[in-house]
């Protein structure tokens, strides 16, 4: 259960719960891999909690360009699968 930051605070910075889950997961993996932390202090000892605190602070956002590239890659993959049939 998420107590801090609140889901309402998190959704101010991310447009859906699904996007929030994906963003928090990706950022948590980055923190675990040794990426620099974006806040000087965290309330949560866990990386997912740290990621959510960074999202609530507005330090982590979804890059719209990467979303477009991802969608384009999915379309190209589907087209290449059709061509191979």
Swiss-Prot record:
Gene Ontology biological process: DNA-templated transcription
Gene name of the record: rpoZ
InterPro entries the record matches: DNA-dir_RNA_pol_omega, Pol_omega/Rpo6/RPB6, RPB6/omega-like_sf
Family annotation (SUPFAM superfamilies): RPB6/omega subunit-like
Assembly mode: The RNAP catalytic core consists of 2 alpha, 1 beta, 1 beta' and 1 omega subunit. When a sigma factor is associated with the core the holoenzyme is formed, which can initiate transcription.
EC number(s) reported in the record: 2.7.7.6
Record GO terms (molecular function): DNA binding; DNA-directed RNA polymerase activity
Role description: Promotes RNA polymerase assembly. Latches the N- and C-terminal regions of the beta' subunit thereby facilitating its interaction with the beta and alpha subunits.
GO CC terms, sorted: DNA-directed RNA polymerase complex
Similarity comment: family membership: Belongs to the RNA polymerase subunit omega family.
One Pfam family hit: RNA_pol_Rpb6
Source species of the chain: Latilactobacillus sakei subsp. sakei (strain 23K)
Keywords: DNA-directed RNA polymerase, Nucleotidyltransferase, Transcription, Transferase
Catalyzed chemical reaction(s): RNA(n) + a ribonucleoside 5'-triphosphate = RNA(n+1) + diphosphate
Protein name: DNA-directed RNA polymerase subunit omega
SMART domains, alphabetized: RNA_pol_Rpb6
PANTHER family the record matches: DNA-DIRECTED RNA POLYMERASE SUBUNIT OMEGA
